Structure formats: C-alpha cells, structure tokens
Amino acid sequence: VRLLPILLNQLSFKTNPSAHMHLNQNATLSFKFEIFNQSIKQLIHEKLPIYLDAISNFPLQVLDNVFNKSTGFSLKVGNDFIEITNPFEVVGFDETESLLPIDQHTHQAYRLLMEYFCFPEKFNYLNLNLNFLKHLPIEKNEFEVLIHLKLNLNDQACIQNYAELNVANFKLFSTPVVNLFNKQAE
C-alpha cells in the first residue's frame, strides 16, 4: 500500500428531491478531502485505495449506486462546481488481483465466485483515480468529491444507512490481504 499526503476529513449525505431532478438524481454523497504539503501535482497520477467498511451488504449497495449509469459526479472547490466523469474504479475483479491459486482449466467466473465466498470483503474496495485534481488550483488544499445518486426516497432503511455513513466507514490506504507466510489456500 502506498501512503499519499491526502486525508478524508468529512463525509456527508443529503437528499435533495429537486436539485438534480432533470438528471433523475435526488441525493448527494459528499467526500471532503485535504491535501498536505502542496502536493497536488504529485497526486494527479495516483489512485487512492478506499475500503467500504459498513454493515452487512450495504457496501455492495453503495458500489452498485456508484457505478449506476444515472449517477453523476462533480468536484467542489470553494464555491465552484466542476462536473467530472466517474473517478472510481472497482478493485478485486482483475485476474492479477486474484487471491486463490488458479490453473488454466479454471474459468474466471468460477474463480471470482470462489473468492467472493472465501474473501467477501475483498470486493468492498474502490480506487479513487485522482486525475481530476488537474482541475484544482495549486493554492487550494481542500476539495469535495460529490456523488449525485438516484435513490428511492421511500426506502427509509436505505436512506437511514446512507445517513449513518461517516469517515470511519471509508478507510484509506488499506489492502484486502497481506500474505506474510507462503501458504496454500484451500
């Protein structure tokens, strides 16, 4: 894991039934970050690993909404909003990220299924591609990534789960597995 000079300061969720109605987006999940040591240029080509640590299957629901076609993204710098493409990438599905040994006869889908049942938390990871920082003025060290979601506002359990999210649910600089000893997984 590569440590970067960036910190997730605040996370907030709010429903806004009419703000993005023309885009069918009625809720916003906001991530407020702080950059240290004026290191924007260093961070532009980096990917920030994020682990979604929440109750039961809710991380999967968050991931599903992040990668939904109707979801929009913007960067907030001060009072300015800049629309950006989805800066998030899924982690754990690529063959190079496999944890279980595979042979040439094992189908990729079977490997993913086995890994999901052995290591379900492995699929609660995201990478935040920091390439959008090119829009950030050099003198700024704080910004927000806004995720504009389309949620069923009548689903009170879902809204409550989003409202209870906080910074502790999004762990930076973590990795799914550290293999300290060479041992065959069975």
Language-model-detected regions and their locations in the chain:
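Intrinsically disordered, low-complexity, polar/charged repeat-rich segments
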Residues: 1-186
